[in-house]
Amino acid sequence: MAKDERQAALDAALKKIEKNFGKGSIMRMGEKVDTQVSTVSSGSLALDEALGVGGYPRGRIVEIYGPESSGKTTVALHAVAEVQKQGGTAAYIDAENAMDPKYATALGVNIDDLLLSQPDTGEQGLEIADALVSSGAVDILVVDSVAALVPRAEIEGEMGDAHVGLQARLMSQALRKLSGTINKTKTIALFINQIREKVGVMFGNPEVTPGGRALKFYSTVRLEVRRAETIKNGTDMIGNRARIKVVKNKVAPPFKVAEVDIMYGQGISRTGELVDMAVEKDIINKSGSWYSYGSERIGQGRENAKNYLADHEDVEDEVRLKVRAAYGISDVPEEDLPTTEDEQINILPDDSTEE
């Protein structure tokens, strides 16, 4: 077949596809109006930098997993607060029935506007998620957690009954249905997950996440949250140092790490991560135990430097702008970013194996 004939056949096929499935169902990638990944800040400057694109990508699935009390829910609630600050709508599916309104409020979440569901079964929770995403009016959806999405058959059965693979099949079916809708509606879907240990594993990592393999494949970003150390004020424990590792990233290089202070009752310490990032870029100078900004000493010890920035908002804002510029994190608000409703990027699993 000659080159002209091949091109004519291709053009005819493209016209037929657009006629059958609508304009925008197929296009050359260079013809897309916007190729920039649209994002929303995670609420943590250090995590935004680790994600590589300045936050969570819109229209994608994100998995946050880790041990108990490591800070997974805190990370998710900060993202909810950021979406609400920009005037967006947030929904929270609390399958664990453990939402603390007081703590959420302390993190900046407007609980009056937060859509909350506490489903009875896994099927119900995922149906609610599908309905919310399909509406196109929800900017971020949090499912807390995948491990708590118990299939109806297990709820209605007897204790001790074997239900092999039920949850994995449920998640696989749900994600096949949800992934395309999430992409088209530009919803950020955050799935919080726990970890389990395989019995009898002698070599390698015995830790696995519940719900089968489907979520691993469909996720654009996977974050591993672990508690690194305890933060103390004298003998009092006032928080945890959390290590957030980007173990999978389809929109930027993976394996970057963000370390943040999660203070009890307050969430992620913005001044703590700001001090660390500013020191790394020599915006704040550290000599011995003393921290100084310009010609002024701002504290002896990291905690005192954090307190200084918290007490001097003008200095904090100035340092934050310099840090964002040094790390190349955009200052453009989300609403000012170019968007397109016709953008069609399929979220395909990495592998055909889903369970």
Swiss-Prot record:
Compositional bias of kind Acidic residues: 332-344
Segments for region (Disordered): 331-355
Cited Gene3D superfamilies: P-loop containing nucleotide triphosphate hydrolases
GO molecular function: ATP binding; ATP hydrolysis activity; ATP-dependent DNA damage sensor activity; damaged DNA binding; single-stranded DNA binding
Alphabetical list of SMART domains matching this protein: AAA
Keywords, comma-separated and alphabetical: ATP-binding, Cytoplasm, DNA damage, DNA recombination, DNA repair, DNA-binding, Nucleotide-binding, SOS response
Gene Ontology terms describing biological process: DNA recombination; DNA repair; SOS response
Main location: cytoplasm
Binding of ATP, residues: 66-73
Top-level taxon in the UniProt lineage: Bacteria
Keyword Disulfide bond found: no
UniProt similarity note: Belongs to the RecA family.
Biological role: Can catalyze the hydrolysis of ATP in the presence of single-stranded DNA, the ATP-dependent uptake of single-stranded DNA by duplex DNA, and the ATP-dependent hybridization of homologous single-stranded DNAs. It interacts with LexA causing its activation and leading to its autocatalytic cleavage.
NCBIfam families per record: tigrfam_recA
Identification of the protein by name: Protein RecA
Organism encoding this protein: Latilactobacillus sakei subsp. sakei (strain 23K) (Lactobacillus sakei subsp. sakei)
